[in-house]
Amino acid sequence: MDYIEAHRYSFANKSMLEKEKLCDCFYCLEIFSPKEIKEWWEDDHGWTAVCSYCGMDSIIGESIAYPLTKEFLKKMHQKWF
């Protein structure tokens, strides 16, 4: 799995996440509906989701072609934290 490629989807992801049914946080490992996201951070590239459970900007959506599983999230967490 390409954890670097998957990580790229955690930035400026508002338009993508608004179309998703599920997303996940690779910091706290929660899998949830993007409708639960209450905070977005703006930067030069767009709006980035902030996890409602842990406050980190480590959210990726289900359509990125990587599995939304606890195992994948744990490996993402190990790579980036």
Where are these regions (language model features)?
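N-terminal, charge-rich interaction modules
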Residues: 71-81
